[in-house]
Amino acid sequence: MFAVNLKICIFLSLVSFLLQCKNTLANVTFEQKVQTNLSHDKNGDIVYGHREFKGGIYAFLGYDNCTIEVNKTVNGIDWNEKKDVKVSGNNNIAVVYSIFTSEEKMILIFKCDNKFYITKYGKEFKWSDPKVIDVSNVIGTNTTPAVYSGSLLSMNNDFEKYILVCENHSQNYINVVDQEYMREIRLLGKCMLSFDEGNNWKNEVMNLYSDEGYTKINTLRLSDYGGKILVKGTNAQNLNQTIRSIILLCSNLHDWKLFCGLPTIRFRKDISVENLTYLNTYHLAIVKNEDKLQLAFTYDLFETFDPQYLNTEFNGVSHYFVLAPDEMVYLFYHGNEKKNYVIKIKTVPRKIGCELNTNDTVNKIYTYTYKYIYNNKLSAKTCKVPSSHLKYSSDGLYKLFEVRLPKDIKVTENCFRYSFLSDLNNKYHTTIIKTRVINKLEDYVEVQFHFPIYYTKFLYNYKSTYCVLSNNYRIVVEFDYIRNHIDLDFPFDTDTVKLYSNESVTHAFRNNTEKTHVHKFPKGTYMTSYFSYEKEYVISNYIEEPFSTTFTILTQTQMNVHFMAGGQKYKYEGIDLTDSSPNYELSLNSLSDSQNVDIFVSKFDNNKTIGFVCPVKSSYDGLNCFDNVYIKNKTLVKIEYLFGENDIFVVPQRRIYKTEGTAMESLLYLNNNNVKKLIDDKSIIHFYCECNVNNNVIKVNYYISPFYDENSIKQEINKKDQEITMINKTIPQDEKDILFNNEKVVPLSNEPQEIIQPPIQEKLNTTDPSKAYIYGANIIFIAIISIISLSISSFI
């Protein structure tokens, strides 16, 4: 009897313990402040790396003799390991400018005796010899650094990484005339950029501007904030008023001018924000309320900030949030009497995605919810997710997020179907984010959405796509990196602007007529239109030579535009039947008298982009490529089924701007996984597209295989039908998967595919496609407890 009672007692204790774990699973908690043993006998700041590196947290202190003292801690309190970075033969004080941290290395940029140096710390755990870098364009003898500490930054997409070094050039507007003070934008700083980790630096200086009212900012600190640059200014002045701090977010870039403004996150008017960061799926902030500093955070990452407060108050300056190991964030700050403190914050990671709550409970499992969105007939309830906050798949090829839905709520067929053309019927749109069910329980299902990171090269920033649920709620994904964008109707100080490759240009007009709005653009410029009074142009990725043109803007004045030569050609395997893109080797001029063209795609690296340009206005004119393609007997099939998998992605058809006529481009992208599968299958994919050129139907055959070379493919083609075994061998035989109506495009079904195996191992959100893994700790923990329980039971 005693044994039975003991078993029951152990069981109840375990249940109670597990329930407690469940209730505190996503609660943000903290430890009381502790003084660290890190000290600095100079007046300069201690600069911390923004995240741990190889299990350690690093602090950087500038000293005499051109020395940077690098301290390391594991627990945030005891700084026991110290290394020096030093330039010999110099007695001046070293000043830290930038610290970049990735999975593989730390990059330190510092200044001494008006020279800039760069040094790197990698897997050998030693600093490289400091190397002088030429950033003389940004040097100012009387200016102070705008210190950056963070990840490698992303511009326009996930692939374009850069580092920067900046000087504080915020001007003193106190003794200037009113007209100068009322200027719309004010200079914050000047930065130099490198896209190869400091080996080469761009000649152009990137200016930071703000449209917020201030007269001077004494100290600028920069950090990454979900793909953008966050500016933290302290000891700011606005005429005769002193402002303790100012927080700005930079997102618009043009002509190497980066424009910063107040973030969309808002606090109450009686609260001032001293610091703000985004770490480990939380917004974290230090706020000042009635002369008291408090720690605040939010569970919901949507645009509104409804903060929760941690029950701690403190005084100090130079606050640094640092992402530490074991799901912790350390807050370091400088207190009174030159003492340094740390507050440890437990931030349990959540799933990136949306939680459809049926009551007013706080979302602690997912990063977004529908709770704060006002629901009315004009605006459906929406959960908005920025692409820069999404996590990567374990192979680094996809962006992922999850949505938890009650079992009676379904994903509809028009989920995440998108088009660059506002006038196109949605049945011709392209499914750009695909779904699969990863967890199916009695009361709810979890649906995972995924799309390739390559999309961020094509789905331009601040463009969004949405999914409608069966209850009319919406999930919105915004592609939101720092972008190269200019609005020609924005009030400029000049009537002349420069435009560069890949820039997005908005132009509004009073009368939407084709004749009055014909302009000369570089070859390969795309055009979109979301409103009847406005057009947007995405300048070609490659401008062969410079030229000029003029635009009539809304004020009916002339804007002179100079297109600057430069950029990079992309290589698309396919053909341009309009000769309107710089990215194709084959064009209309390459055609012989034959109306059939064979494209052999057999030379592969790790990926491949396949393209087709046809002189039509839209899919209405019969352009079936690449969402649906033709196979033999003019049979129309879905591209996913042709490749035998659901990880094939098509870029929505885009309209290429032409002064005469029109052209549409469709792109099919094959990533590493797709290529590997084709190699393993030893198969050849064949399909064709048709295009009407000057009343002649041209048939373009695509033969795709990374396993066979072009000669082998031709040999297979020349065989008799019954002998051909390698071509399209993965096409399903089910009739419902093959469409015979070649007069219209049938939309792809987007009903979530149920995945039988467990969820794939995924990485946490980061701007680098590499970080710690989620291993399903709860399941492992329960398994361990179960084993212990069974062991005790056996013992008894």
Curated annotation (Swiss-Prot):
Keywords: Cell membrane, Disulfide bond, Glycoprotein, GPI-anchor, Lipoprotein, Malaria, Membrane, Signal
Phenotype of null mutants: In strain D10, causes a loss of binding of human CFH to the merozoite surface resulting in a 7-fold increase in host complement-mediated merozoite lysis.
Keyword Glycosyltransferase found: no
InterPro entries linked: 6_CYS_dom, 6_CYS_dom_sf
Pfam families: s48_45
GO biological process, one term: symbiont-mediated suppression of host complement activation by recruitment of complement control protein
Glycosylation sites: N27, N37, N65, N71, N168, N240, N275, N359, N502, N511, N607, N633, N728, N765
Subunit note: Interacts with host complement factor CFH isoform 1 (via sushi 4-6 domains) and CFH isoform FHL-1 (via sushi 4-6 domains); this interaction recruits CFH onto the merozoite surface preventing complement-mediated cell lysis. The interaction does not affect CFH activity.
Function description: During the asexual blood stage, recruits host complement factor H CFH to the surface of merozoites resulting in the down-regulation of the host complement alternative pathway and thus, protecting merozoites from complement-mediated lysis.
Name of the protein: Merozoite surface protein P92
Species name: Plasmodium falciparum (isolate 3D7)
